[in-house]
UniProtKB/Swiss-Prot annotation:
One of its GO terms (biological process) is translation. InterPro entries: Ribosomal_eL34 (IPR008195), Ribosomal_eL34_C_sf (IPR038562), Ribosomal_eL34_CS (IPR018065), Ribosomal_L34e_arc-type (IPR047868). It holds the Pfam family Ribosomal_L34e. The keyword Ribonucleoprotein applies. Residues 41-72 are annotated as: Disordered. This is Large ribosomal subunit protein eL34. HAMAP family: Ribosomal_eL34.
Length: 88
């Protein structure tokens, strides 16, 4: 095993080869789930993936198509209500 693969920053994936042997493939771990910028709740609609995996996705799969996609829906509603009330 290579020295760099001894650390736990690499995920171990056990793969059965056609010859019947079980070998270990090393993969980088997935990043943490995206969180709301205000309350810190996990965001839905944003995939977990390394940058090279996300690069292959279309733009609509990378983030929600609504105003303020970095906020959860409840925080977004709260801000939009405050903005609407401030303009009156």
């Amino acid at each position: 095993m290579k020295t760099m693969h001894r650390s736990r920053s690499w995920r171990r994936k056990y793969v059965r080869t056609p010859g019947g042997r079980t070998v270990i493939h090393f993969e980088r771990k997935k990043p943490k789930v995206a969180h709301c910028a205000m309350c810190g709740r996990p965001l839905n609609g944003i995939p977990r993936g390394r940058p090279n995996e996300l690069r292959k996705l279309p733009k609509t799969k990378k983030r929600p198509e609504r105003p303020m996609p970095n906020l959860c829906p409840s925080c977004m509603r709260r801000i939009m209500k405050a903005q609407a009330r401030a303009t009156l």
